């Protein structure tokens, strides 16, 4: 899977949490790393790390157990394309996606948790100027139900040209705007050393060339 083996993914999380990298100058020290790992271990549990294949059903079964033992605030399925998708007899992909997303929605409501599904677009499209178009949930392989069934949809997209280089946070759908905010775009910078996002400041012309 994209974030396996887990130890490598955990190291990335330690870097993000501490704000320090494991390489280069001013690298993270052992004490800081161990403290960060301890805190992360108290708050994050991994599902499906010892299995050859993971299905939505097995994820929810394990999440149910973890919720009983520890109490969960959220569940992240990342990424969608590494999950083994088992279709029922005569079930096409559109109906499968609709059924599975409905089951995730029901699980979230029953257990009062947030569920995030991280999914990649089929392919990146370009406009007439050969500029990459910001993908939407409709561009995810499988079904338009990724947009229709979700309460909220967010696209994280890198914008890079000769004038700017930033990460765009495109909030493309908010079902309950009266309490969860509105659609729109935010700009963030990305720190390649520690993997953290921060406030974006546009570079002036002298800094670009």
Show the residue positions of the predicted features:
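A glycine-rich, aromatic-flanked flexible loop/lid motif
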Residues: 10, 33-43, 72-82
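C-terminal regions of RecA-like/P-loop NTPase motor modules
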Residues: 20, 24-27, 35, 57-75, ...
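Signature of the SF2 helicase/ATPase Hel1-core->accessory helical subdomain module
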Residues: 82, 122-123
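A short beta-strand-to-loop transition that corresponds to the Sensor-1 phosphate-sensing loop
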Residues: 1-3, 113, 117-122, 159
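Walker A/P-loop NTP-binding active-site region of P-loop NTPases
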Residues: 1-24, 79-84, 149-151
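Hydrophobic/aromatic beta-strand patches that form the interior of the parallel beta-sheet core
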Residues: 45-47, 116, 154, 186
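Conserved P-loop NTPase mechanochemical-coupling segment
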Residues: 34-54, 122
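Non-membrane alpha-helical structural segments and their capping/turn regions in soluble enzymes
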Residues: 56, 94-98
């Amino acid at each position: 899977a994209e974030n396996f083996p887990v130890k490598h993914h955990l190291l990335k999380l330690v870097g993000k949490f501490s704000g320090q990298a494991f390489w280069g100058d001013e690298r993270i020290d052992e004490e800081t790393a161990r403290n960060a790992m301890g805190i992360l271990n108290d708050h994050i549990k991994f599902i499906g790390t010892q299995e050859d294949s993971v299905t939505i059903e097995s994820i929810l079964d394990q999440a149910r157990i973890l919720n009983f033992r520890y109490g969960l605030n959220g569940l992240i399925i990342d990424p969608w394309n590494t999950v083994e998708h088992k279709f029922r007899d005569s079930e096409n992909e559109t109906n499968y996606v609709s059924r599975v997303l409905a089951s995730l929605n029901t699980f979230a409501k029953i257990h009062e948790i947030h569920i995030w599904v991280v999914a990649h677009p089929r392919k990146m499209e370009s406009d007439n100027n050969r500029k990459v178009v910001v993908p939407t949930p409709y561009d995810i392989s499988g079904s338009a139900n990724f947009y229709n069934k979700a309460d909220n949809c967010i696209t994280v997209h890198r914008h890079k040209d000769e004038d700017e280089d930033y990460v765009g946070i495109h909030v493309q759908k908010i079902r309950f705007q009266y309490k969860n905010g509105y659609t729109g775009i935010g700009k963030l910078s990305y720190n390649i050393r520690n993997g953290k996002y921060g406030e974006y400041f546009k570079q002036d012309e002298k800094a670009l060339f």
